[in-house]
Amino acid sequence: MGQTKSKIKSKYASYLSFIKILLKRGGVKVSTKNLIKLFQIIEQFCPWFPEQGTLDLKDWKRIGKELKQAGRKGNIIPLTVWNDWAIIKAALEPFQTEEDSVSVSDAPGSCIIDCNENTRKKSQKETESLHCEYVAEPVMAQSTQNVDYNQLQEVIYPETLKLEGKVPELVGPSESKPRGTSRLPAGQVPVTLQPQTQVKENKTQPPVAYQYWPPAELQYRPPLESQYGYPGMPPAPQGRAPYPQPPTRRLNPTAPPSRRGSELHEIIDKSRKEGDTEAWQFPVTLEPMPPGEGAQEGEPPTVEARYKSFSIKMLKDMKEGVKQYGPNSPYMRTLLDSIAHGHRLIPYDWEILAKSSLSPSQFLQFKTWWIDGVQEQVRRNRAANPPVNIDADQLLGIGQNWSTISQQALMQNEAIEQVRAICLRAWEKIQDPGSTCPSFNTVRQGSKEPYPDFVARLQDVAQKSIAIEKARKVIVELMAYENPNPECQSAIKPLKGKVPAGSDVISEYVKACDGMGGAMHKAMLMAQAITGVVLGGQVRTFGGKCYNCGQIGHLKKNCPVLNKQNITIQATTTGREPPDLCPRCKKGKHWASQCRSKFDKNGQPLSGNEQRGQPQAPQQTGAFPIQPFVPHGFQGQQPPLSQVFQGISQLPQYNNCPPPQAAVQQ
């Protein structure tokens, strides 16, 4: 490791010396050990880095990118390396010009002499460029032990000394006295350039802040108090302020003047700072005009209408949203509503917005519903008391008086609001390709569908089908009560007609159905079925009438009168004494007519009916009728089969027992 450090130190000796001088002059102290560690990492991951070093800021930015890539791959890069890299990159930024910086080796050998001559002949900008190109040549070309320190001081610090001479208040306390371009005395030679000497640094003096100035056109110039009307704003500095100068109020000096600040101005300034200036352009803006001569107090100020077209970014967002989500998706409705209410849109703007965002078939639907809405609005304007002087040509942006943009820009606020409402309503009626609008009667809640989703579908269908808002609200409330699944319907049934005045019925229904279908709800339903207690804590009651006592709220089998006073009621109603042991089952005191036992006290089954008739003999029937065999020649002489069976039945019947007469004789 020691050999590697010594190798790095000898390889980049000149460049290391220059970097240390540059950083020390900027008020930053970096140890040689940390710089050697930095160049070890650079040599490991950036083999393209030149041995003679470079002053090109692009090369150091490239080093940072490659070190980040190495860190992502798992290589360990010390924190000091990142700190030193950032410090060196920041120190090289003032030396960059519009042209690419050259490598150190490309500078001519006589640059030290030519540099001083050129700086006296050229302007300040050209001087800085030449200084950036040739500043490192004396350090790189020779060893630090052979450098003329007086000449090196003049080469490295000419512009810094000039700036210090112009702005002495920006220099630290130790160097508050302006200095010219004279050479350094022998005692003030930088420590890093003194050969084989060790000088103890004075740590009591604070380091000089490293400051630099951008070109004049890039500097921020705060607005004057008289221009923007901010009483607490400090006056602008007389000289060149250090970069960057943080703004106090407004972020855009080129914005139009305003007499008082507002939140809208701050938002617009922030968007302009971020680069999104087109998003805040209003199609039509009304700017107050200065009062003319003879204007009386109390008169409304005269305004001037100015039109600006939509930004390409806004139209692109609308087109992508319609293509990806659909014209009536929640995202598109919110975006369209914000554009409509945040801008003063004229009919021409609505047409451009629809043409650029919708497909041809969707635009045809939008135009159709637009015309239909205009006709309805014109009828309302004529029926109003007093009539509203807004015709169909104005709402559509057609005709001789309203066909141009300049004419539409002068529309009244009431006409703008009517156009907005009509176009938003027409946009909502646009149907996606291949989809049909179902009837609100057919919208029903699924068995596992959440109640809010069902209501959202119902509202969407009703909004496309019913034009009148009051009728749409009544239909939605009715269908939200009639068409949910049985679980939600049982939850909202107690709220029918009991919602307080001023409360939203749909919101109350949604609250009542909150959590329906979940695991907790199913567990509560099971507990309800077991205990008879509903979710609200009330006992479930039967709505019918008891057939025993005539009261409402229970069945006959659960009648408390029947269960408690059954015997007394039977005795008083029948007029008989209480029954004794049942003669049928022998195991209960009740009447035999009321016995419902299927087994007696011994476990023997009991028949359902006590008295039965005698069992009848089974009648055996054959599959085919019996036909006796008769020869072919005796068919006419054979008697019918019925006569044969009748004769057989008249014969005496004998069995194993002798007749009674024979038994007596024996």
Curated annotation (Swiss-Prot):
UniProt-recorded Gene Ontology molecular function terms: nucleic acid binding; structural molecule activity; zinc ion binding
**Which keywords does the record carry?**
Cell membrane, ERV, Lipoprotein, Membrane, Metal-binding, Myristate, Repeat, Transposable element, Zinc, Zinc-finger
Instruction: Write down a Pfam family by its short name.
Output: Gag_p24_C
What subcellular compartments does it reside in? Cell membrane
Q: Carries keyword Membrane?
A: yes
InterPro entries hit by this protein: B_retro_matrix, B_retro_matrix_sf, Gag_p24_C, Primate_lentivir_Gag_pol-like, Retrov_capsid_C, Retrov_capsid_N, Retrovr_matrix, Znf_CCHC
Q: Which GO terms describe its cellular component?
A: plasma membrane
Reproduce the UniProt comment on modification after translation. Answer: Myristoylation is essential for retroviral assembly. Alteration of the glycine residue leads to a block in the budding of particles and an accumulation of Gag inside the cell.
The zinc fingers classed as CCHC-type run over 544-561, 580-597
Please tell me where this protein is predominantly located. Answer: membrane
Sequence ranges of Polar residues compositional bias:
604-622
Task: Name the residues where the record annotates lipidation as N-myristoyl glycine.
Answer: G2
Which residue ranges does the record annotate as region Disordered?
170-189, 223-264, 598-640
Keyword Phosphoprotein among UniProt keywords: no
Mark out the compositionally biased spans (Pro residues): 232-247
The record comments on the domains as follows: HERV-K Gag polyprotein contains regions homologous to the matrix (MA), capsid (CA) and nucleocapsid (NC) proteins from infectious retroviruses. Evidence suggests that HERV-K(HML-2) Gag polyprotein can be cleaved into mature MA, CA and NC under certain circumstances. However, the exact boundaries as well as the size of processed Gag proteins have not been precisely determined yet.
What family, per the record? Answer: Belongs to the beta type-B retroviral Gag protein family. HERV class-II K(HML-2) gag subfamily.
What function does this protein fulfil?
The products of the Gag polyproteins of infectious retroviruses perform highly complex orchestrated tasks during the assembly, budding, maturation, and infection stages of the viral replication cycle. During viral assembly, the proteins form membrane associations and self-associations that ultimately result in budding of an immature virion from the infected cell. Gag precursors also function during viral assembly to selectively bind and package two plus strands of genomic RNA. Endogenous Gag proteins may have kept, lost or modified their original function during evolution.
Q: What else is known?
A: Insertional polymorphism. Provirus present in 29% of tested individuals.
| Name of the protein in its database record | Endogenous retrovirus group K member 113 Gag polyprotein
Organism name: Homo sapiens (Human)
Species lineage, top-down? Eukaryota, Metazoa, Chordata, Craniata, Vertebrata
> Which gene is this protein's source?
HERVK_113
